Amino acid sequence: MSVNTKNWQELKKPTQLDVKESSDKARKATFIAEPLERGYGLTLGNALRRVLLASLQGAAITSIKIENVLHEFSSLAGVREDVTDIVLNVKQIALKMEGEGPKRLQLSATGPAEVKAGDIAVSGDIEVMNKDLVICHLDEGATLNMELTADIGSGYVPAVQNRPADAPIGLIPVDSLYSPIRQVSYKVEKARVGQELDFDKLSLTIETDGTVTPEDAVAYAARILQDQLTLFVHFEDGIPQPQSAMIGVAAEPQQDDANQLNRYLLKKVDELELSVRSANCLKNDNIIYIGDLVQKTEAEMLRTPNFGRKSLNEIKEVLSSMGLRLGMDIPGWPPENIEEMAKKLEQELLG
C-alpha cells in the first residue's frame, strides 16, 4: 500500500514543551506547546483536558466505620461535628497509594483534640498528602475510633456504588473522587513562525492534589491518547519498528531497516554527544545503550536526579533524528550477548 507520509511529516510540530512552574511546583504548572497547525491547539487542549479530568487513576476513601455509630445521621457524644460532617471532611482526604486495594486505615483520638488527616495510621505504601485537613473536634473525655477503607480507581464513584452487598451494620459508604486532578484549563493563542501568524500556541494549566506531579499527569494523559489512537493506524509508515530490533534473521525486504535499528539500539549513549549534564544523568541511572534509553518514559526520565526538562528535550531531539523515541517497547532487550552483538553488527556494517 502506498502511504502518503507528507500527511503528518510536513505539519508544524513543537520542538519542545516549555513548563512554567508555580510557587507550588509539585501541584501546579503550565505547559506551553508551539507552534501548532491552526486548530490543533483546540483539538489537543480539549482532548488532554478531558482525559486528565476523567481517566487518570488515584486513591480515595470508599467507606468508613465509626465505633458506636450505626449510620451517617448519628451523632457522637463529645464530638462537635455530626457524622454527616465527618463524612464530608473524609471525602477531601488526598491519598497516595501504591499496590492494589482495598486497604484498611485506622484513626483513633482522645479529646480534647483537633483530629486531622495526618492522625490517620498508615502503612508504608500509603501517604496522606493533606495532613492538615481537619476531620472533627473532640471535647474533653471524648473518643473517636474509626476504620477507613481506601481503594484505587478513576473518575467519580457515588457512595451507593461503594456499599458492598454484604456490608456490615455501621459501614458508611463515601463518595469517592479518585481523580488526582483538581483543575485543568487551556488557552489557545496565535503563534508566529517567521513572518506567518497562522499557527496556534497552546497553554495548558494543570493543578493536582499533590499525589501526582503536573508533569507526570500530562504525560499519562498523552500516553492514554496515544494508546487509544494506535487502533486507527492500519499501516507501517517506514519508521523502523522496535519489534524487529532483536530478530536474529529478518526477512530480506526488511533487512536494512532491522540492521539500521539494531545499529542504533546497540550504540552506547556516551557516543551521542550529549551535554555533560545529560550524559552524567544517564550514567548515574545505569543507562548504557540506546536500547536501554528508549525504553524509559518521559516521566521516568524526569524522576532521575538532576535531570530536567532541558535535558529531556535534548535527548528527545537526538532520538528523533534516528527515528526513535522514549517509551518504546523492545521485546528481548537486553540480549544476553549484547557486547558481542554490538561488535559483530558494527563489523558487518563497516565490512
From Swiss-Prot:
GO molecular function annotation: DNA binding; DNA-directed RNA polymerase activity; protein dimerization activity
GO biological process, one term: DNA-templated transcription
InterPro entries on file: DNA-dir_RNA_pol_insert, DNA-dir_RNA_pol_RpoA/D/Rpb3, DNA-dir_RpoA, RBP11-like, RNAP_asu_C, RNApol_insert_sf
Span list, region Alpha N-terminal domain (alpha-NTD): 1-236
NCBIfam families: PRK05182.1-2, PRK05182.2-5, rpoA
Domain comment, as recorded: The N-terminal domain is essential for RNAP assembly and basal transcription, whereas the C-terminal domain is involved in interaction with transcriptional regulators and with upstream promoter elements.
Family per record: Belongs to the RNA polymerase alpha chain family.
Stated name of the protein: DNA-directed RNA polymerase subunit alpha
Organism: Erythrobacter litoralis (strain HTCC2594)
